[in-house]
């Protein structure tokens, strides 16, 4: 059984990557970063696309694609409704409420803290395939804007994915197993949060400024975002190909001439 990067490496001249990177070099740099347990574990774009290939169910595939295209935390993605998406050209986007802010809203509902303005972040949806597939899913599965809560009897905004975090982990596990059965394996463990890390690294490879990425990720502190640059710095340094050596005899001649 071979790892996914091997066949892609051999076919790299014929494959168009979504972001222009030296894929074999990026793989090598990721393997280097995995030595440090504190650094994020992420997949590269070809690996994510390959994983999605093994998710035939449209609803499941689009949840994982949403994590990949938005960098959302799993609870943020599971809270999404149709109204959170604006798919109108030329700038489709999704509105996400961050983990901390959603927790505060729940606390206010329980009467434990005063109400305040709930902050959301807007994440552009720049991938046309993703937007098209999302529209197809909504139309095909007839996902409603609202539905009646059977427990309370109230009409509420309908969540697109009425599942739990554990269910999503099961979906991912099934996809990884299906890939392995087909001879495709992944170098890092895949969890819902892996897609968030993968989004961040993909955006850095695409040249997105760090402060912009901080906003897209919903990080309160820039230090949370800077962890990705610790990995990305390896790529930057490698691409510059900084040399340290020169012919020793030439160096000696230079120094002698300096004193001539």
Swiss-Prot record:
Active site (UniProt): 73, 105, 193, 196, 219, 228 (o-(3'-phospho-dna)-tyrosine intermediate)
GO molecular function: DNA binding
Entry superkingdom: Bacteria
InterPro entries for the chain: DNA_brk_join_enz, Integrase-like_cat_sf, Integrase_catalytic, Resolvase_Rsv, Tyrosine_recombinase_XerCD
Keywords: DNA integration, DNA recombination, Plasmid, Repressor, Transcription, Transcription regulation
Domain Tyr recombinase: 38-241
BP GO terms, sorted: DNA integration; DNA recombination
Pfam families (alphabetical): Phage_integrase
Family classification: Belongs to the 'phage' integrase family.
Function according to Swiss-Prot or TrEMBL: This resolvase acts at the RfsF equivalent resolution sequence of pColBM-CL139.
Protein name per Swiss-Prot or TrEMBL: Resolvase
Gene: resD
């Amino acid at each position: 059984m071979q790892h996914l990067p091997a066949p892609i490496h051999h076919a790299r001249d014929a494959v168009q990557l979504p972001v222009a990177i030296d894929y074999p070099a990026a793989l090598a740099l990721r393997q280097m970063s995995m030595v440090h347990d504190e650094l994020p574990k992420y997949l590269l774009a070809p690996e994510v696309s390959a994983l999605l290939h093994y998710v035939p169910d449209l609803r499941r595939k689009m949840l994982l694609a949403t994590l990949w295209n938005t960098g959302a935390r799993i609870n943020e993605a599971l809270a999404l409704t149709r109204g959170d998406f604006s798919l109108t050209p030329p700038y489709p986007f999704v509105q996400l409420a961050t983990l901390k802010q959603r927790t505060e809203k729940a606390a206010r509902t329980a009467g434990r803290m005063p109400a305040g303005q709930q902050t959301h972040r807007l994440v552009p949806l720049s991938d046309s395939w993703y937007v098209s597939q999302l529209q197809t899913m909504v139309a095909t599965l007839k996902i409603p804007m609202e539905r009646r809560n059977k427990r309370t009897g109230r009409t509420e905004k309908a969540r697109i994915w009425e599942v739990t975090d554990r269910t999503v982990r099961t979906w991912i596990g099934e996809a990884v197993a299906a890939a392995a059965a087909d001879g495709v394996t992944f170098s890092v463990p895949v969890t819902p949060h892996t897609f968030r890390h993968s989004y961040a690294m993909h955006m850095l490879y695409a040249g997105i400024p760090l402060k912009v990425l901080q906003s897209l990720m919903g990080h309160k502190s820039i230090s949370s975002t800077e962890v990705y640059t610790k990995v990305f710095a390896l790529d930057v340094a490698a691409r510059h190909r900084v040399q340290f050596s020169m012919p020793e005899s030439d160096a000696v001649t230079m120094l002698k001439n300096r004193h001539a």
